[in-house]
UniProtKB/Swiss-Prot annotation:
Biological processes, Gene Ontology terms: translation
GO MF entry, a single one: small ribosomal subunit rRNA binding
Protein name as catalogued: Small ribosomal subunit protein bS20
Residue ranges of the region described as Disordered: 47-77
Lineage: Bacteria, Bacillati, Bacillota, Bacilli, Lactobacillales
Signal peptide per UniProt: none
Purpose of the protein: Binds directly to 16S ribosomal RNA.
Length: 77
């Protein structure tokens, strides 16, 4: 464990950020899986939106976001 006050604070902040980022990524994956289970326009929009949010927050690379959305669009027909 860190001894310096600023290092302790950063460690605590990193734990909180990790929880927040993990939840956001999990929500994105859940939306994608919901679409894949039952492809519809409404679920496509929800999945696409969650991918865009993850991209804008830096959780996934912009190329991965684009690739994922293209694959979902192809499944939509």
């Amino acid at each position: 464990m860190a001894n310096i006050k600023s290092a302790i604070k950063r460690a605590e902040l990193n734990v909180k950020a990790n929880e927040k980022n993990s939840a956001q990524k999990s929500a994105m994956r859940t939306a994608i899986k919901a679409f894949e289970a039952n492809p519809s326009e409404e679920l496509f929009r929800a999945a696409s939106s969650s991918i865009d949010k993850a991209e804008s927050k830096g959780l996934i690379h912009k190329n991965k976001a684009s690739r994922d959305k293209a694959r979902l669009a192809a499944k939509l027909g």
